[in-house]
A protein has these predicted regions:
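Juxtamembrane intracellular "pre-TM" segments in multi-pass secondary transporters
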Residues: 2-27
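Extracytoplasmic gate region of multi-pass secondary transporters
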Residues: 20-74
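Helix-to-loop junctions at the C-terminal end of transmembrane segments
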Residues: 73-86
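Structural signature of the two symmetry-related core transmembrane helices
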Residues: 89-103
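Paired small-residue
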Residues: 112-120
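Intracellular juxtamembrane helix-capping segments at the cytosolic ends
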Residues: 126-140
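A late C-terminal transmembrane helix in Major Facilitator Superfamily
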Residues: 139-184, 195
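Multi-pass alpha-helical transporter architecture, strongest
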Residues: 182-207
Length: 207
């Protein structure tokens, strides 16, 4: 049975309005950048660590603790976020861990790489958890939350899909990992800025 035209209009309303929402775009861009950070790290960290002097087995193994602490961050951070009036500092601090992680891998000693990788794991997991919980925290209705989720995840993962490829291209272009690591550290800073903005109290109806 066909749905009445009025029902279809009401159902599509939140999805159309969401694209004109400043808050929705902040959440979407934050979602995209934090996804780039995660996928770049799991795609290229073993190669980076090997070039820094770590043996292949140890470099590959380093992803395991990173993903474990990432899972913990993605589970725990939304619990803290739900108890806060706004999440701007939680989000900025989580992304700052990625700045320290990538920056440390870029400029620090390989002996400190395990520490920086753990910080990166906590940061990437926490930012992911916050991005997901923003779908409900920045919405007044389930329809808005669904529309925001669709917008943020579709655009966010499209952005993320290009991240590892461009990171590898920068390596090929420059002939070293310093340039792409400097760029991804910069992307981490941008993620913190958008995360701070997306974490401020408000919803998708705000202008």
């Amino acid at each position: 049975t066909a749905r009445p035209q009025s029902d279809l209009s009401q159902a599509s309303g939140p999805r159309l309005r969401i694209w004109r929402s400043r808050v929705a775009w902040l959440v979407t861009i934050f979602m995209g950048f934090q996804s780039i950070l995660f996928y770049v790290s799991i795609s290229w960290l073993p190669d980076i660590l090997q070039e820094r002097g770590m043996n292949a087995e140890q470099a590959g193994w380093m992803l395991s603790p990173m993903q474990l602490v990432s899972m913990a961050g993605s589970f725990l951070m939304p619990l803290f976020a739900a108890r806060s009036d706004n999440q701007k500092w939680l989000t900025a601090a989580s992304a700052a861990l990625c700045v320290i992680g990538f920056g440390g891998i870029w400029a620090g000693s390989v002996s400190l790489a395990p520490l920086f990788i753990l910080l990166l794991g906590v940061g990437s997991g926490s930012t992911f958890g916050l991005a997901i919980v923003f779908f409900s925290l920045r919405s007044r209705t389930t329809e808005q939350a669904s529309a925001l989720s669709g917008m943020a995840q579709s655009i966010g993962y499209i952005l993320a899909a290009f991240g590892p490829t461009l990171f590898g291209y920068l390596h090929d272009l420059s002939g070293n990992w310093d340039t792409p690591l400097a760029v991804i550290t910069g992307v981490s800073i941008i993620t913190a800025l958008f995360g701070y903005a997306a974490g401020r109290k408000g919803d998708v109806d705000a202008r």
